[in-house]
């Protein structure tokens, strides 16, 4: 009987101990290691493409659903008006460069020699005019010549003197060369004409529309023959690389997430396929949970936005698709 009592006491003590140690868990004070789950969507990354110049669309090379690579030419404008503009701008630039070169080179040696000869000729004419005036002045007192003839001789001397001074100034200008201000003005005109030609060439290059990155054509907005301006959209491109997931983490779980952390992602479309991802960005600003996020928590909770970069996403993850982000297991203190 005594042995039975001892056995009953041992069993009762064991049950009491089990109940005691299980009490915190039943009261919610202790939790088992768990795997946190976040909810989000594959980020929508699109770019609207258009020409930087106005013109008529001559060719559209891709259609909706076509895949393109960065640098692929997907549309062209009629380039003939732009080629003509380039030709005119280059000709104008060549004229201004020639004018500048002429000013910098100054007068040729033959031109200076000719100006010097002209000056010497004008000096000789001036000397003859002076002699004629002196003779007329001596003849006038005795009445050999009239006053009108004396005045004519004086006028001829003054005209010869003016021609000699003009020839001298022309020679000095040629010998000294062009003014620095004139050369600077010509240089500025040449630079402006060169810049205009460069701009015309850039406009010619802009008649081709190239894909800025790899992607899939989402929309073809215009058709061949349409007249477009720089504000008009021709294509909408969906960017396929890299694939980002936009997810949200509540403030109590924020300490479990850090940039560079590895996570796994699943989708409702292929729940058995697991994608590997890396947390690349955590927003420093809290926001309310977006209405598009499927979450069991209250939508009025403040959350922090995450950007997760998917490695080897394949073609199953499409933009806007809802996904589930699984964080690594973490033990929480009781």
UniProtKB/Swiss-Prot annotation:
It comes from the Bacteria. Keywords: Coiled coil, Periplasm, Plasmid, Signal. It is found in: Periplasm. Residues 101-208 form a coiled coil. The keyword Signal applies. One of its GO terms (cellular component) is periplasmic space. Pfam families: HlyD_D23. NCBIfam families: PRK03598.1. Belongs to the UPF0194 family. This is UPF0194 membrane protein RB0873.
